[in-house]
A protein has these predicted regions:
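Residue-level hotspots within the lipid-embedded alpha helices of multi-pass solute transporters
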Residues: 26, 60, 115-116, 146-150
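Alpha-helical segments in transporter systems
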Residues: 22-26, 139-145
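Structural signal for membrane-spanning alpha-helices in multi-pass inner-membrane proteins
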Residues: 25, 42-43, 153, 157
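Short amphipathic helix-loop junctions that connect adjacent transmembrane helices
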Residues: 37-46
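Transmembrane alpha-helix interface/packing and boundary motifs in multi-pass membrane proteins
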Residues: 19-38, 113-114
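Hydrophobic alpha-helical transmembrane bundles that constitute the permease/transmembrane domains
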Residues: 33, 119-123, 143, 147-151
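Membrane-interfacial helix-loop-helix
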Residues: 1-20, 47-126, 130-139, 155-163
Length: 163
């Protein structure tokens, strides 16, 4: 595949790919590290016909939707579902417990703050669901944090790429 063919494909399917990767990442599926992928997306956008603001917006929507899946599972499934999914990992449980305490102390803004901290930003949906945070708070604060994170990473790649 030539570089020209790759960019043509990215122009056609890039937004679908970006949204799919972001959605999966916020659902905590392994293999989707935003810290690596999002700056690369910015570079690709700079070299394509895609819009930076549209890409950031759609990545935020995909991130919120992916987060809502985990939030809903924990909201309605509670501790038994979390135990079933992550019961063996003491480190993971410890991170979730720390996020839980931080959100409980900081309320909604704690959720937005955690959304920009690598390694724990995607698991914050779990304690938010377990705490039964109101969905409008969850979506609002998640969108705020995800917007900051995705904008920073995609813009980094976009503005520091050689056009």
């Amino acid at each position: 595949m030539t570089a020209e063919t790759f960019f043509q494909l990215f122009n056609q399917y890039g937004l679908i790919l970006v949204c799919s990767v972001v959605f999966c990442e916020y659902m905590n599926l392994p293999g989707f590290p935003a810290g690596v992928i999002m700056p690369c997306v910015g570079v690709l956008i700079a070299r394509s016909e895609l819009s930076l603001p549209l890409t950031v917006f759609l990545s935020v929507v995909a991130g919120v939707l992916g987060s809502l899946v985990i939030y809903a599972v924990c909201y309605w499934g509670g501790e038994p579902v979390m135990e079933k999914l992550f019961g063996r990992s003491k480190k993971f449980k410890s991170l979730v417990r720390k996020c839980h305490e931080f959100i409980d102390a900081q309320h909604g803004r704690g959720l937005a703050i955690i959304r920009v901290i690598p390694c724990i930003r995607t698991i914050v949906s779990i304690p938010a669901g377990l705490l039964r945070m109101p969905v409008k708070w969850f979506v609002g604060w998640s969108a705020a944090g995800i917007t900051v994170w995705n904008t920073a990473l995609i813009s980094f790649g976009y503005f520091f790429s050689e056009k």
